Amino acid sequence: MSEQENLLSVRQVYQGFIHGDLGAILKPLAEDVDWQIVGHYKNVPWPAVWRGRRELERYFTILAEALEVELFQPDEFLVDGDKVVVLGHERMVARATGRIVEASWAQVWTFRDGLVIRYREYTDSAAWESAYA
C-alpha cells in the first residue's frame, strides 16, 4: 500500500472517531492490531493496552461512554513508508467528574499490507489522571 493510502486510512479513522462510526474506525485495523496509549494510567476508566479488533470495539465503546469530545484536532501528518505520525490536540470532558482535559498528543500508526498493525499514542497522562482523580 502506498504512503498516501496509509494516510487516507488514518484520516478515515479520525472521521469515524469524530462521528462515532465504529465501523470506520475498525475497518483499516489488522485483526491482531497492537494498540497502546503510552504512560502511567491508574484512574482512567479504560486500560492503556489493547490487543486485537475485538478488544478495540470495547475500548471505543468505553471512550464514547466516558468522554464528551469538544475538540479533536489532528494538526500535522508525517508519512514515511509504513508509518504515519500525527501531531494534534484535544479537549474533552470526563463525564464521570465533569473535568475538562486539554492535551496535545502524538500518534504513531504502523501499517503492513494496508492494515494498521501497531498504534502508539503519547499524550499528557498526568492531565488524564487528574481528570479522573
Task: Give the residues covered by each predicted segment.
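A solvent-exposed, acidic/Ser-Thr-rich amphipathic alpha-helical stretch
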Residues: 24, 30-81
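Short glycine/serine/threonine-biased micro-segments
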Residues: 18, 37, 50, 86, ...
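Residues at secondary-structure transition points
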Residues: 1-4, 8, 47-54, 100
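Short, low-complexity N-terminal intrinsically disordered segments enriched in polar/charged residues
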Residues: 1-31, 131-133
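Alpha-helical structural motif
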Residues: 6-9, 21, 52, 59, ...
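Hydrophobic pocket/interface hotspot
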Residues: 10-13, 25-29, 33, 52, ...
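A beta-strand edge to alpha-helix "cap/lid" segment located at domain peripheries
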Residues: 1-5, 61-133
